[in-house]
Amino acid sequence: MREIVHIQGGQCGNQIGAKFWEVMSDEHGVDPTGTYHGDSDLQLERINVYFNEATGGRYVPRAILMDLEPGTMDSVRAGPFGQLFRPDNFVFGQTGAGNNWAKGHYTEGAELIDSVLDVVRKEAESCDCMQGFQLTHSMGGGTGAGMGTLLISKIREEYPDRVMSTYSVIPSPKVSDTVVEPYNATLSVHQLVENADQCFALDNEALYDICFRTLKLTTPTYGDLNHLIAAAVCGTTCCLRFPGQLNCDLRKLAVNMVPFPRLHFFMVGYAPLTSRGSQQYRALTVPELTQQCFDAKNMMCAADPRHGRYLTCAVLFRGRMSSKEVDEQMLNVVNKSSSYFVEWIPNNVKASICDIPPKGLKMATTFVGNTTAVQETWKRVAEQFTVMFRRKAFLHWYTGEGMDEMEFTEAESNMNDLVSEYQQYQDATADEEGEFDEDEMEG
């Protein structure tokens, strides 16, 4: 079985994670105590991708929860599915990282990391044939960003051949929680570029917009946002957990989605997104789902795919549908909007079909796109970073934890390199191949 070990770090990561496990348990018919109450054998067939079966038929999530302060953990434990998790898998410190990346990565986090790695090893050993890890975290904080990236690099050393995928909440342009977000995010990207295989970029502003515009929620809470993220995360792994006509797993996704190793930041979309009131007035058809999931309004990241070009994308369908229709729709999209796809990667749209839809729906799709437009997000963060770093504002918090200014400069230039790489491939055309090689030789 292809198991996935789930890790959640920091406040944001733990809250997304808690919601994710609610959705996951619901899909597999597991109640908050870990007992199975499902109605179909399909729910049990590959339940051990995410769950471990304990004595007495209890299903326990393969989840590791870490934080540098006990607060969020306590609320997860007190939440509806708090009793589901294995108590030993809660690893937390007492001090907190205080939104300081250096504390999470170098001081406080480094003290706690060994106990987290012990739990990771335990979970990995209980797997039959582990496929990889998934981490939910934010990039703007201290624990999720600093300690999360530290954990990724440690796991990378120990399990170099396993897929590492992250669901990273990027600081959004309008909704800011802390002043030092640009610092934390830039330092995190510096790590993720090197050590992760695929990063699903999410941000709160785009999620707010979806809740507000599409779902017609007047006052969206973090719970609503996290529910959207959870739906998308479940969609990216459904083919591992349920039978399908065209399967897709984390590694297949990575191979098909990442044309150049550094460019592994994806935008995620989900369909159908309709407000609760208008659900019954719309027919869910494959064309409608396809059209919706390519729509810029459905992207969970505040970058507009129309401003860039898709290097690759994958559409993961769920539900009973004809594969012929899916293929037709995919062709249709590529032919109609061919200018949005780079022409030097033929067949760069991958579709997969999983037969079991999410709870309460007949069909759904998750969209994962590797578009050059994601550079907008990094550009924005880099600009904010530069403005503060030029004045060395707030820098003493980081140097006080033993960081060097040089590290900031490196992270900044790595971020700028990433942006210009995206731009280079956005401008590249199929017949320019020769010119590129010459440039590289001269350089």
From Swiss-Prot:
SMART domains: Tubulin, Tubulin_C
Primary residence: cytoplasm
Residues that hold Mg(2+) according to the record: E69
GO molecular function: GTP binding; GTPase activity; metal ion binding; structural constituent of cytoskeleton
Domain of life: Eukaryota
Keyword Transmembrane helix among record annotations: no
GO cellular component, one term: cytoplasm
Biological-process GO terms, alphabetical: microtubule-based process
Cofactors named for this entry: Mg(2+)
Function as written in the Swiss-Prot or TrEMBL entry: Tubulin is the major constituent of microtubules, a cylinder consisting of laterally associated linear protofilaments composed of alpha- and beta-tubulin heterodimers. Microtubules grow by the addition of GTP-tubulin dimers to the microtubule end, where a stabilizing cap forms. Below the cap, tubulin dimers are in GDP-bound state, owing to GTPase activity of alpha-tubulin.
Known partners and oligomeric status: Dimer of alpha and beta chains. A typical microtubule is a hollow water-filled tube with an outer diameter of 25 nm and an inner diameter of 15 nM. Alpha-beta heterodimers associate head-to-tail to form protofilaments running lengthwise along the microtubule wall with the beta-tubulin subunit facing the microtubule plus end conferring a structural polarity. Microtubules usually have 13 protofilaments but different protofilament numbers can be found in some organisms and specialized cells.
Family: Belongs to the tubulin family.
Stated name of the protein: Tubulin beta chain
Species annotation: Thalassiosira weissflogii (Marine diatom)
Organismal lineage: Eukaryota, Sar, Stramenopiles, Ochrophyta, Bacillariophyta
